[in-house]
């Protein structure tokens, strides 16, 4: 088989040219990073779990009419997705105060926010993905006003879907991050959800105990990250309840 051409490698995924024009193969790695990659580890099985979970969420969104780049899962670590022109903005939706909003605004972690709050972050690792306003986005032409309106609408629909799905299995969706890309169909452009949706990009807390089931387990050294992700996958029915536990993380020197 011919060697595939690598398009891009990020912290958690590798993108390869797809088998058909306009497609990409997205490969999920076992690497975990935090604090702008200052903290690193290899977590056996993490890529498999995120591939399956992102497939689950993207398929669900497609099913309710929220367009995503997901086409199909190819194997345990890879999925076929549509090629998109990524807008260089991360969209964060917050339902409960945690992480940077608690630090910035002095809101105690766990405080329910009066409504979902949408934030924008400029995608630039060298700058630490700084928070930006709509004015910045339009002034620097990262996206148009219409794009922004569509991005917010997409993000809030994702929030409604994800909140309901998680609530049904006893998990609170604290916040999440998505990326959005442009696809061109004839003379028309539309925006679709891209990248991934997984515990890497969400904060997930057990409703009863407050136990963290997301990447904060790794950030804060709260336990075994693969066990937390496996718990989410099992509750959602993505993995059977008797799935083999993942091995413990191995730190990279």
Swiss-Prot record:
Disulfide cross-links: none
**What's in the keyword line of the UniProt record?**
ATP-binding, Ligase, Nucleotide-binding, Purine biosynthesis
Keyword Metal-binding appears in the UniProt entry: no
> A GO biological process this protein is involved in?
cobalamin biosynthetic process
Catalytically driven reaction(s): 5-amino-1-(5-phospho-D-ribosyl)imidazole-4-carboxylate + L-aspartate + ATP = (2S)-2-[5-amino-1-(5-phospho-beta-D-ribosyl)imidazole-4-carboxamido]succinate + ADP + phosphate + 2 H(+)
Entry-linked CDD domains: SAICAR_synt_PurC
Among the GO molecular function terms of this UniProt record, one is:
phosphoribosylaminoimidazolesuccinocarboxamide synthase activity
Q: Which Pfam families match?
A: SAICAR_synt
What EC number(s) does this enzyme carry? 6.3.2.6
Keyword hit for Magnesium: no
Q: Which GO terms describe its cellular component?
A: cytosol
Pathway(s) it belongs to: Purine metabolism; IMP biosynthesis via de novo pathway; 5-amino-1-(5-phospho-D-ribosyl)imidazole-4-carboxamide from 5-amino-1-(5-phospho-D-ribosyl)imidazole-4-carboxylate: step 1/2
Q: SUPFAM superfamilies in the record, alphabetically?
A: SAICAR synthase-like
The family note in this entry says:
Belongs to the SAICAR synthetase family.
Question: Which NCBIfam families does its entry note?
Answer: purC (TIGR00081)
Q: What is this protein called?
A: Phosphoribosylaminoimidazole-succinocarboxamide synthase
């Amino acid at each position: 088989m011919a060697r595939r051409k690598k398009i891009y490698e990020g912290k958690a995924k590798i993108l390869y040219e797809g088998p058909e024009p306009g497609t990409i193969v997205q490969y999920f790695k076992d690497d975990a990073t935090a604090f702008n990659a200052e903290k690193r580890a290899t977590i056996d099985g993490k890529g498999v779990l995120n591939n399956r979970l992102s497939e689950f969420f993207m398929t669900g969104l497609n099913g309710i009419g929220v367009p995503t780049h997901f086409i199909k899962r190819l194997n345990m670590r890879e999925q076929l997705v549509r090629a998109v022109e990524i807008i260089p903005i991360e969209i964060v939706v917050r339902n409960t105060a945690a992480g940077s909003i608690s630090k910035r605004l002095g809101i105690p972690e766990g405080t329910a926010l009066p409504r979902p709050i949408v934030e924008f972050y400029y995608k630039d690792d060298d700058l630490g993905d700084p928070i930006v306003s709509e004015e910045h986005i339009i002034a620097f032409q990262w996206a148009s006003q219409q794009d922004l309106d569509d991005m917010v609408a997409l993000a809030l629909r994702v929030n409604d879907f994800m909140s309901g799905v998680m609530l049904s299995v006893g998990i609170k969706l604290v916040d999440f991050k998505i990326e959005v890309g442009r696809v061109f169909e004839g003379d028309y452009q539309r925006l679709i959800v891209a990248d991934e949706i997984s515990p890497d990009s969400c904060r997930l807390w057990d409703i009863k105990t407050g136990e963290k089931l997301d990447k904060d387990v790794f950030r804060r050294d709260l336990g075994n990250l693969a066990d937390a992700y496996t718990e989410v996958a099992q509750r959602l029915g993505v993995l059977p309840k008797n799935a083999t536990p993942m091995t413990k993380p191995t730190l990279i020197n």
